[in-house]
Amino acid sequence: MKLHELKPSEGSRKERNRVGRGIGSGNGKTSGKGHKGQNARSGGGVRPGFEGGQMPLFQRLPKRGFTNINRKDYAVINLDRLNSFDEGTEVTPELLLETGAISKLKAGVKILGNGKLEKKLTVKANKFSASAKEAIEAAGGTAEVI
């Protein structure tokens, strides 16, 4: 196969439908909008959730819960991602950010226990799940809360 032989796959490219261009096109006159009414007008249509004047479902249901302003959002990382570091490395939130293991520090870093850790590491983080702490210590490393 050569570059000049490449063709788009069947059905992946579709021609634009030009409406209002004569009755023979199948989309002339009313351009597929039917006769009159709110939806036939320019800019016409109803907002999402509108039920024709009936009290919409989202307004019939009670409000629930609240947003906790004191919530702390942690950058989470699993144990299997820590295997990319060399044996004996001191893993800090700054190092994780530098290497791209996490994209933002947020309120801190939490280490979760998914995966298997095969290296002895000193891990410093704001929080550890119980299983993560256990696995780090089982691998001969230490888990320090900062």
Swiss-Prot record:
Record-level Gene Ontology MF annotations: rRNA binding; structural constituent of ribosome
GO cellular component assignments: cytosolic large ribosomal subunit
Residue spans of biased composition, Gly residues class: 21-31, 42-52
Extent of Basic and acidic residues compositional bias: 1-18
Record-level GO BP terms: translation
Pfam family of the protein (one): Ribosomal_L27A
Keyword terms: Ribonucleoprotein, Ribosomal protein, RNA-binding, rRNA-binding
Stretches for region Disordered: 1-57
SUPFAM superfamilies in the record: Ribosomal proteins L15p and L18e
Residues forming coiled coils: none
PROSITE patterns named among the record's database cross-references: RIBOSOMAL_L15
Family per similarity comment: Belongs to the universal ribosomal protein uL15 family.
Stored HAMAP family: Ribosomal_uL15
Assembly and oligomerization: Part of the 50S ribosomal subunit.
Role noted for this protein: Binds to the 23S rRNA.
Protein name in the entry: Large ribosomal subunit protein uL15
Organism: Bacillus pumilus (strain SAFR-032)
Gene: rplO
